[in-house]
Amino acid sequence: MAFNFNWSPLMADAGFYTRAQELLTAALNKSPKPPIIVDDIVVTELNLGSNPPELEILEIGDLAEDRFRGIFKMSYAGDAFLTLKTCVQANPLNTYLLTRHPFTSPQPLAAATGLTIPLQITLSDIKLSGFVILVFSKQKGITVVFRNDPLESLKVSSTFDSIPFVRDYLQKEIEGQLRILFMDELPAIIHRLSLRLWGTEYSELETTSAQVTNPSLDGPGLDPLLNPPQDPVDASGNVLSISEIASLSLDSGVEMHSLFSRKNVLRLAALTDSQRTLSLFTPSIREVVFRAWTGSMEQADGPSGLVSPMSPPLSRTHSHIATSSLSLQDAASLASSSHSRPTPPSSGFSGYGLSMGAGRHSKAHARKRKKRVVDLRRRPKSADDMESVSGESAYTTTTSAVSVFSGSTIPEENNDDPVTPPVSPQRTIRRPTLRDRIAARDDAERNSRRGIPAEFGHDLPAVRTSPPIANDMARIIASASNLQRQLQQQQPADSKPLPSLQETAPIRTLRPSPSSTPQYPTEKPNASNNYTSSSSPSARDPQQQQPQQLSRPSSSFIMESAQNGGILEQAWMMKMASEIARRIQDEKMGGEDPTNSSSRGGSGGGFWERPSMRSHTPPPAYRH
């Protein structure tokens, strides 16, 4: 079966090419264009050529007088051509710079920007080959569908053929767009053309839609600005009455155009007032320069010399932080008004916060703020706070109460001046140091220490915290040697030498605390006498000790040595006094019972073997 295609009527019909150009232009601009094309693509020339396409019938599905459906194999290599016109943004130098390293590029300034150039492209030597499904109906027109991509090749001729890069780029982009055109847009274009040829209803519908899109008016168009608005105002914002509007001439177009709606003028005024600020976040108007206006006088000096209607002139406003008006009562007022309820502080916060005002002096309601400071820190004890203890009085503890005092009145700060730091109080509260605390504790222990037992008839004198000097020690040693000589003269011939001090223990000793007892350096024993201090290192070795014979001391010797000695000397004197008292009692008992004395002498100190008279308390030198 063979068919003859009459190609000449299509070429002879001028209206066909016009409609085809419009449809192709709409189809090319429908899809998104590449960024290099900055204008619409317009089809200026279209020619189908003199050579028709070759069709091979593969299948006929339906055949009738008013309808046809079949599958064809189409091939076309004719002289048809298509000319397009658009504008592109071409910059070959910028493309060259993008492909080179920045170190070697010359870095041009003006030539690196894009340049819009008109472009004309001609498509020719089109070769098509593919399978086509053709469906024809007088009611529905012609439908052509390509089962595969029919475009094999084409030739693209443009204004930039002398530039290889641009030529290749355009060839590639246009081929891609034509492939989309054949697969998607060309079937729709052919269908609409067929409807125009055979469908009368479709042609009438298109005519009606064109009239709606471009309405044709019988008379000339009316200017909407010539009709006065409902609330007309003049250029200065003054409302015009009906008589003033009627007095205006209808021929004076300038006067009539100056009538604007009051609502629109207010919106424009609000928009312009929003620019009279130094804020960085206000909306900006293009091609308009604004500056900050501070008052109405400066606004009138502007280029227009007019004040926007219904918009008050801007004035400089000042804000300040109002101080809290809540005052705290001091100690004196609390003491005087203990039976009355304090005033409620709710009304005191009326001026607190951010106060805005048009004037600079908007602090009339601000009140001075008072402060009450409570000192909770422990302060050092003074001599007046301590109570002296005499005799056998018990320990007493003195504590200083927490002091509550009111701070000095702070002068009101001037809000116009720069903020200054608060003034320090006149009285400086110093925290006691470690030395002060140690001295206070020593004073308390010295005042609360127990005295000498009442049987000696004297109280313990004040303790001297300073270490003993050489003169005091020499005096004590000299008086001790005199006592030894007196005791040797008064001692009977049959009495035995008394044991040393290291073998005895005191009846009552003072136990000073380790923290309050100063650590004095030990002194070497004197070679001229046999006396050895119990605090010396030689007292720790029993082999270096020699028996010392002591007798009843006098009260003057005890007081003199106690006044001149330190804490260790006082303990030693108490120890000596207890030893002497015991030995006197032993002598009395020995005088009454000589047999016991001889038996004790034979046993070598049997008196010290009595468990009732033996003290288990170690001497002070061996305590830990």
From Swiss-Prot:
Disulfide bonds: none annotated. Residues 1-195 form the SMP-LTD domain. Keywords: Lipid transport, Lipid-binding, Membrane, Mitochondrion, Mitochondrion outer membrane, Transmembrane, Transmembrane beta strand, Transport. PROSITE patterns: SMP. GO terms for molecular function: lipid binding. CDD domains: SMP_Mdm34. GO terms for cellular component: ERMES complex. It is found in: Mitochondrion outer membrane. Residues 215-225, 332-341, 525-554 have a biased composition (Low complexity). GO terms for biological process: mitochondrial genome maintenance; mitochondrion-endoplasmic reticulum membrane tethering; phospholipid transport. It comes from the Eukaryota. Component of the ER-mitochondria encounter structure (ERMES) or MDM complex, composed of MMM1, MDM10, MDM12 and MDM34. Belongs to the MDM34 family. Component of the ERMES/MDM complex, which serves as a molecular tether to connect the endoplasmic reticulum (ER) and mitochondria. Components of this complex are involved in the control of mitochondrial shape and protein biogenesis, and function in nonvesicular lipid trafficking between the ER and mitochondria. MDM34 is required for the interaction of the ER-resident membrane protein MMM1 and the outer mitochondrial membrane-resident beta-barrel protein MDM10. Lacks alpha-helical transmembrane segments, suggesting that it resides in the membrane via beta-sheet conformations similar to those predicted for other outer membrane proteins and porin. This is Mitochondrial distribution and morphology protein 34. It comes from Ajellomyces dermatitidis (strain ER-3 / ATCC MYA-2586) (Blastomyces dermatitidis).
